[in-house]
Curated annotation (Swiss-Prot):
A Pfam cross-reference name: ADI
Lineage start: Bacteria, Pseudomonadati, Pseudomonadota, Gammaproteobacteria, Enterobacterales
Top-level division of the source organism's lineage: Bacteria
Catalytic reaction list: L-arginine + H2O = L-citrulline + NH4(+)
Native source species: Escherichia coli O6:H1 (strain CFT073 / ATCC 700928 / UPEC)
Active site residues according to the UniProt entry: 397
Protein's name in the database: Arginine deiminase
Name of the coding gene: arcA
Amino acid sequence: MMEKHYVGSEIGQLRSVMLHRPNLSLKRLTPSNCQELLFDDVLSVERAGEEHDIFANTLRQQGIEVLLLTDLLTQTLDIPEAKSWLLETQISDYRLGPTFATDVRTWLAEMSHRDLARHLSGGLTYSEIPASIKNMVVDTHDINDFIMKPLPNHLFTRDTSCWIYNGVSINPMAKPARQRETNNLRAIYRWHPQFAGGEFIKYFGDENINYDHATLEGGDVLVIGRGAVLIGMSERTTPQGIEFLAQALFKHRQAERVIAVELPKHRSCMHLDTVMTHIDIDTFSVYPEVVRPDVNCWTLTPDGHGGLKRTQESTLLHAIEKALGIDQVRLITTGGDAFEAEREQWNDANNVLTLRPGVVVGYERNIWTNEKYDKAGITVLPIPGDELGRGRGGARCMSCPLHRDGI
């Protein structure tokens, strides 16, 4: 049965979401490779998995459908065309050489689809291939080198694709460590029975090509509703990527305006949702740095000729108020004194997942910010995050809404 896929806001009733439980990819993280793979530290994968199960069950207890990326990928591999496409794109002749690549693809094609999905996200080392596969490429590599690097950032399903009103952007990622993630999502959205033939728009990123500087990540995209989309211009999401997405949204009449805000280019502000999330009709959780009056902000609208009209805004808050038709945005800033606020922002106090207006999921460790939410009438459903939080992503980062009501 074809499911409905539509995301009309950040705060309407959440109905269906895609998550990725920690698996082999995080077990491949070591102190020597974690920074290359965009992590600050190694995690206890078993404990992270337990915490993730609590997160998923919290959503299920609220009546929200939870789909797991590994399950979707495994089921997608049941489609012969999808399996062939994924093996061709993820095991490249140009990376491994035509003979070795063919041998590896042939061997992978014979394993169970669950095991193949595990390797497509968790990576593959030279030590794992059969001894019968012999090649100069094998002879010149250490057994612990990667044939296919792991994708530990699949944990953050928010970034690789984002649903915006009646369509999806399958995002070209900025960092090499994440670019192969997008191919797994391309395959799921093309061939999985849940999505294949669905009446939704693919705005951007569905082609497996070099997007150069036109990169986009879902953590920077907030569907604030009423025909508006708010996008952070970060170290991962570029003006070029924003323009491509905005033009597609306007072409398909799915948005009336796109608000673009420039973010500080440092690790703690990696994406807009690490410093700002929409949690109630007129209420945003923010780390104050992003709403300073001197932050650059523009509103993009259609120019009537297929291009974009750009309007400089006086402040981000004013742009949001105009878009939502409200008199004043209410802000809940990160809690505690200056030291506590910086610590809690680093631990994703602002990166909460709104389930419905005024109800969010967030890490229990952020006690000062959670107390401010409570005093403001926002209900926090707390989840543990001592290990998950070390990946530098909270409940919003770890979730990709597939169906959410508008406002």
